[in-house]
Amino acid sequence: MARIAGVDIPKNKRGVIALTYIFGVGRSRAIEVLEKAQVSQDKKVQDWNDDEIGGIREAVSFYKIEGELRSEVSLNIKRLMDIGCYRGIRHRSGLPLRGQRTKNNSRTRKGKRKTVANKKKATK
């Protein structure tokens, strides 16, 4: 099992798929990395030799990935909340950011339903 950028890459998968296990590396970036390292996309991770792994590590090191990328994303969200813009307010209140309706859906962002007791109707 190869270890790249602090992530254990599954050895039984093809290189392109295996590299997507790294946070910040998708399909297209995985293809770029393999081209820079001159490794075949169809080659499985278990068939990589030490030189190829070293080349891949070097190619991946030019990108922001894993912890560095996670911290940048969280700092961006924190900045939005600090300046008090609309997206920051929505982040702070745990609601959808991109204009979705919230009357019926958005259970993922709002969490489990909170029941509200009905007022008893006044009798005539």
From Swiss-Prot:
Gene3D superfamilies: 1.10.8.50, 30s ribosomal protein s13, domain 2. One of its GO terms (cellular component) is cytosol. Residues 100-124 have a biased composition (Basic residues). One of its GO terms (molecular function) is rRNA binding. Keywords: Ribonucleoprotein, Ribosomal protein, RNA-binding, rRNA-binding, tRNA-binding. Pfam families: Ribosomal_S13 (PF00416). InterPro entries: Rbsml_uS13_C, Ribosomal_uS13, Ribosomal_uS13-like_H2TH, Ribosomal_uS13_bac-type, Ribosomal_uS13_CS. GO terms for biological process: translation. HAMAP family: Ribosomal_uS13. Belongs to the universal ribosomal protein uS13 family. PANTHER family: 30S RIBOSOMAL PROTEIN S13/40S RIBOSOMAL PROTEIN S18, SMALL RIBOSOMAL SUBUNIT PROTEIN US13M. This is Small ribosomal subunit protein uS13. It comes from Flavobacterium psychrophilum (strain ATCC 49511 / DSM 21280 / CIP 103535 / JIP02/86). The gene is rpsM.
